[in-house]
Amino acid sequence: MDIEMVDLLRKMVDEAPFGMYVLDGERKIIFWSQGAEHITGYSSEEMVGKHCFNGGLDHIDSTGLHLCHDFCPMMATIFDGQSREQPVFLKNKAGKRVPVLVHTEPLFSGDKALGAIEYFRVLPVSEYPIPKER
């Protein structure tokens, strides 16, 4: 793929109305979109190179269970190569919980998952009230 095509793809992702980030197989963030910056308040410079579980997003589910270490949808996708979709609540840079729908997709080389992509979009708080954390 030539440089112009890569630039075009990056521009398309950055202008999309959702956030997106890419993890390698060790759950290190290797790409962080402008949509992700807008939704979370974290810049690409702040997130790229960090492990997703140390990046500050601290996802919880609708019961308040913290997902990032043992119940992470991205970790499960990297492990089993299966797509997932789940409403979760991320913590933005200002420390507020934001309801988002996450969709994870594995990145393969042959039959081996090398990482994963997460797309996320904001959900209405009226339909997804912020749970108490456990």
Where are these regions (language model features)?
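Sensory modules in modular signal-transduction proteins
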Residues: 2-28, 32-37
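Short, acidic, Ser/Thr-enriched surface-loop or helix-capping motifs
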Residues: 24, 33, 61, 92, ...
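PAS-associated C-terminal cap
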Residues: 1-5, 121-134
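Short loop/turn elements at sensory-signaling interfaces that couple input to output
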Residues: 102-116, 122-127
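Short loop/turn microsegments at loop-to-beta-strand junctions
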Residues: 18, 85-86, 102-103
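Terminal output helix/cap of sensory domains in signal transduction proteins
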Residues: 5-8, 55-94
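PAS-family sensory domains
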Residues: 30, 84, 91-98, 114
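PAS/PAS-like sensory domain cap-loop motif
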Residues: 36-51
